Structure formats: C-alpha cells, structure tokens
Swiss-Prot record:
This is Small ribosomal subunit protein uS2. InterPro entries: Ribosomal_uS2, Ribosomal_uS2_bac/mit/plastid, Ribosomal_uS2_CS, Ribosomal_uS2_flav_dom_sf. Belongs to the universal ribosomal protein uS2 family. GO terms for biological process: translation. HAMAP family: Ribosomal_uS2_B. The keyword RNA-binding does not apply. GO terms for cellular component: cytosolic small ribosomal subunit. It comes from the Bacteria. Keywords: Ribonucleoprotein, Ribosomal protein.
Length: 242
C-alpha cells in the first residue's frame, strides 16, 4: 500500500502554510502555530489524512474507477499532467471550463470534435484545405487539446477528483459536489476545506510538495489497478506458477 511518512512531508515543505494575515479560520484545527509570520501546518494531522486519501484512491482504482487529477495553477500543471499519464488516468492542467462535469453532454461533443480534428490532421485532410482553413483548424485543434486533451479518453464522469489547491479549483469542487463525486484536495491555510471529502492540509504552492502529492496519488492509483489486474488474472485462471 502506498503511504507517505512525516519525513517525506518535512523534506518537501508540506508544513509551510501562507502568511498568517491571509489565513482562513476554517483551517484552524490543522494549524500547529506560526513562525516568522507564516502558519505552520500540523503534520500530525496531514500524514494520516493523506494516507487515508491514498487508500481511498487505491480502492477506487482497484474497481476500475476513474481518477481525475485537477491542478490549473502554474506551479501544479506539469506535475498533474505527468502523474495522471503515469497511472493511465485523466487530468485538467490548463483551465477548468465551467460545466466540465455538470454539463458533460456538451463537453462530450467538444471531445468528439477534438478527435475528428486529430484524425483529419494525420489522414491528409488538412493538406487538401486552403492555407487559411488549415490554419484555422490547426488552431481549433490546439485550443481543444489544451482544454480537453487530458479527459478526451475518460469516456464519462470520473469516480474521484484529486485537486491541488482547493481555493483555486473551487468551481471543479462545486461541480463534483453537485454530482456526488468524492473530492480529495490539498487545502492550504488560506483556503476553506468546504466540499472536500478527504482534506489534505498542506502547502499547495511549493514544487517539491506538489510533486510529493501527485507522485503518491499516481502510485496509489497504479497499486489499485495492479490489484484489479491480479484479481482479473486469477478469475481468468492465469495465475503464475510459483
């Protein structure tokens, strides 16, 4: 089972919150104190809470569930994308489009258009167009890929959202809440943990902290999928001989 230790978190700077003047009182239970005007997050809470979240994500993945990684802050985008790809899951790393979950029917049409343009770009269709028309379609393809590339193969709503930065991704969290999709989120001292089912109190800006969260969630999802494949193999009678 994937777990993260106190030492891992200390080394990644998970315990450094925001300046005290920006705090959200709803995070008080998770704050240890302040140092040089910066809130220090109590890792005695964060360690077990994150490990509980990892166990939940692993369980979802073991049942063929879909995990949607969400992190559109500049510091989070790249790590979110890499982690999701590494565990064959899905991501939104650029901008959350309002209605991405709650208006899935419309989003599905846009994904269909994205896939059409992708095949046109490789089957020679673009070459038969005028220069201007080809350029317009290329731009449309790039725009759709940027917004929807990470969810184009999701094939339906996700089973869990993993979010870096609850305040920044409040629209995504609200949409998940409306649809009853559980949310795991990293919540810093300047944010409200409202609507988050699995709160991970921690720094949501430092690259090392973000990488720790994303790689751990990817490892948990991979472990869950491995469990699922092992069960499947057993059911199919493909159990390796000792």
């Amino acid at each position: 089972m994937t777990t993260v230790s106190m030492r891992d978190m200390l080394q990644a700077g998970v315990h450094f919150g925001h300046q005290t003047r920006y705090w959200n009182p709803k995070m008080k239970p998770f704050i240890f104190g302040a140092r040089n005007g910066v809130h220090i997050i109590n890792l005695e809470h964060t360690v077990p809470m994150f490990n509980e979240a990892l166990a939940f994500i692993s369980n979802v993945a073991s049942k063929k569930g879909k995990v949607l990684f969400v992190g559109t802050k500049r510091a989070a985008g790249e790590a979110i994308k890499e982690a999701a790809i590494s565990c064959d899951q899905y991501y939104v790393d650029h901008r959350w489009l309002g209605g991405m979950l709650t208006n899935w029917k419309t989003v599905r049409q846009s994904i269909k258009r994205l896939k059409e343009l992708e095949s046109q770009s490789v089957d020679g269709t673009f070459d038969k167009l005028t220069k201007k028309e080809a350029l317009m379609r290329t731009r449309e393809l790039e725009k759709l890929e940027k917004s929807l590339g990470g969810i184009k193969n999701m094939g339906g709503l996700p089973d869990v959202l993993f979010v870096i930065g609850a305040d920044h991704e409040h629209i995504a969290i609200k949409e998940a809440n409306n649809l009853g999709i559980p949310v795991v989120a990293v919540v810093d001292t300047n944010s409200a943990p409202d609507g988050v089912n699995y709160i991970v109190p921690g720094n949501d800006d430092a690259m090392r902290a973000i990488r720790l969260y994303t790689t751990s969630v990817a490892a948990a999802a991979n472990a869950g999928r491995g469990q699922d494949l092992a069960v499947q193999a057993e059911q199919d009678g493909f159990v390796e001989a000792e």
